[in-house]
């Protein structure tokens, strides 16, 4: 990540805090944990277990896995639930065991896998909790790892919302053998990886250790601040004076910007951060990095989702009344 300074600015440490230095109670209400989901429970049940064991008001998972599917299941804790839609932006990766219902030649199998790379059409399965309309999904990568008789182990990197069970069914039909998904494990879920996923029992043990002995070290290793789940987004760093206005949903203006990440375009989602590294909001850039650096006034980011609660930073901005807005528009004309 390369940040370009638009205007040097200092932060006041009387307000806000470094995300990695939040007290443990705040962390539990503004954090996340990546669970290694076991086979059996639904994703909703796992999120509910996490909520109950950490004694939280709410928790939500970041991407449904069928009961028998295992792997990386990010769980948003407390107020972090508002970040869940942002986790769906990056691709997801799975390792799948596919079973053919008849014999097939290696060459034919390899050709079918090539055919199902790129843009594919999918209709959600009957059991899906969405409208069964035809949709386009992207298969970024698909790789055969091992073939043992009629069993094919493969890895795929795909767009969020891709139905792997349907992908296997469609490949089996195209191959002429028919097929079904025997096992599935999610290895990457957006910005989260399998190797950082933790077992439910380990999370419970760490929580009990903190509650009974006052030692929060193990719990801090497992629970990450919400900013950890937004690392995949390009950043715009704002001055302290702009934070509270953005927290109220105001458009970000050029005068409130301190630093801009290199390479921002108008076709992506960006993260608005404080000088301490706290997530404030996400939004749609109205111009690219180069133009943001040049402009001295005007709107630069349209806010689409506020993350930080208002009131953490001082309110320096003033509400514009309708008369002010009308006068400003008249001046433009």
Curated annotation (Swiss-Prot):
<dbReference type="Pfam" id="PF08068">
    <property type="entry name" value="DKCLD"/>
</dbReference>
<feature type="active site" description="Nucleophile">
    <location>
        <position position="66"/>
    </location>
</feature>
<dbReference type="GO" id="GO:0031118">
    <property type="term" value="P:rRNA pseudouridine synthesis"/>
</dbReference>
<dbReference type="Pfam" id="PF01509">
    <property type="entry name" value="TruB_N"/>
</dbReference>
<dbReference type="InterPro" id="IPR026326">
    <property type="entry name" value="TruB_arch"/>
</dbReference>
<feature type="domain" description="PUA">
    <location>
        <begin position="233"/>
        <end position="308"/>
    </location>
</feature>
<dbReference type="InterPro" id="IPR002478">
    <property type="entry name" value="PUA"/>
</dbReference>
<dbReference type="Pfam" id="PF16198">
    <property type="entry name" value="TruB_C_2"/>
</dbReference>
<dbReference type="GO" id="GO:1990481">
    <property type="term" value="P:mRNA pseudouridine synthesis"/>
</dbReference>
<dbReference type="GO" id="GO:0031120">
    <property type="term" value="P:snRNA pseudouridine synthesis"/>
</dbReference>
<dbReference type="GO" id="GO:0003723">
    <property type="term" value="F:RNA binding"/>
</dbReference>
<dbReference type="InterPro" id="IPR004802">
    <property type="entry name" value="tRNA_PsdUridine_synth_B_fam"/>
</dbReference>
<keyword id="KW-0819">tRNA processing</keyword>
<dbReference type="GO" id="GO:0160148">
    <property type="term" value="F:tRNA pseudouridine(55) synthase activity"/>
</dbReference>
<dbReference type="InterPro" id="IPR020103">
    <property type="entry name" value="PsdUridine_synth_cat_dom_sf"/>
</dbReference>
<keyword id="KW-0413">Isomerase</keyword>
<comment type="function">
    <text>Could be responsible for synthesis of pseudouridine from uracil-55 in the psi GC loop of transfer RNAs.</text>
</comment>
<dbReference type="InterPro" id="IPR032819">
    <property type="entry name" value="TruB_C"/>
</dbReference>
<comment type="similarity">
    <text>Belongs to the pseudouridine synthase TruB family. Type 2 subfamily.</text>
</comment>
<dbReference type="Pfam" id="PF01472">
    <property type="entry name" value="PUA"/>
</dbReference>
<dbReference type="GO" id="GO:0000495">
    <property type="term" value="P:box H/ACA sno(s)RNA 3'-end processing"/>
</dbReference>
<dbReference type="InterPro" id="IPR012960">
    <property type="entry name" value="Dyskerin-like"/>
</dbReference>
<dbReference type="InterPro" id="IPR002501">
    <property type="entry name" value="PsdUridine_synth_N"/>
</dbReference>
<dbReference type="InterPro" id="IPR015947">
    <property type="entry name" value="PUA-like_sf"/>
</dbReference>
<dbReference type="GO" id="GO:0031119">
    <property type="term" value="P:tRNA pseudouridine synthesis"/>
</dbReference>
<protein>
    <recommendedName>
        <fullName>Probable tRNA pseudouridine synthase B</fullName>
        <ecNumber>5.4.99.25</ecNumber>
    </recommendedName>
</protein>
<dbReference type="InterPro" id="IPR036974">
    <property type="entry name" value="PUA_sf"/>
</dbReference>
<dbReference type="InterPro" id="IPR004521">
    <property type="entry name" value="Uncharacterised_CHP00451"/>
</dbReference>
């Amino acid at each position: 990540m390369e940040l370009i300074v638009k205007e040097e600015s200092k932060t006041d440490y009387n307000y806000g805090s470094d995300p990695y230095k939040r007290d443990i109670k705040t962390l539990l209400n503004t954090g996340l944990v990546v669970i290694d989901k076991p086979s059996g429970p639904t994703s909703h049940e796992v999120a509910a277990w996490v909520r109950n064991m950490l004694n939280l008001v709410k928790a939500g998972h970041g991407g449904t896995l069928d009961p028998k599917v295992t792997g990386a299941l990010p769980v948003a804790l407390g107020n972090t639930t508002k970040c869940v839609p942002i986790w769906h932006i990056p691709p997801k990766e799975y390792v799948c065991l596919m079973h053919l219902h008849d014999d097939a030649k290696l060459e034919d199998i390899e050709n079918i896998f090539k055919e199902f790379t790129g843009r594919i059409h999918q209709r959600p399965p009957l059991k899906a909790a969405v409208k069964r309309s035809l949709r386009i999904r992207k298969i970024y990568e698909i790789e055969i790892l091992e073939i043992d008789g009629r069993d094919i182990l493969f890895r795929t990197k795909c767009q969020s919302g891709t139905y792997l069970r349907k992908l296997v069914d469609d490949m089996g039909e195209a191959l002429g053998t028919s097929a079904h998904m025997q096992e599935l494990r999610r290895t990457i879920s957006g910005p989260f990886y399998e190797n950082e996923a933790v077992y439910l029992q380990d999370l419970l043990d760490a929580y009990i250790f903190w509650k009974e002995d006052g030692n929060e070290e193990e719990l801090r290793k497992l629970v990450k601040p919400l900013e950890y789940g937004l690392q995949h987004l390009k950043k715009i760093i704002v001055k302290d004076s702009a934070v509270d206005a953005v927290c109220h949903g105001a458009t970000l203006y050029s005068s409130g910007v301190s630093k801009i990440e290199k390479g921002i375009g108008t076709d992506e989602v960006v993260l608005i951060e404080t000088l301490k590294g706290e997530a404030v909001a996400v939004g749609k850039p109205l111009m690219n990095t180069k133009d943001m650096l040049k402009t001295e006034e005007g709107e630069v980011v349209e806010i689409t989702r506020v993350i930080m609660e208002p009131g953490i930073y001082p309110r320096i901005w003033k509400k514009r009344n309708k008369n002010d807005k009308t006068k400003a528009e008249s001046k433009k004309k």
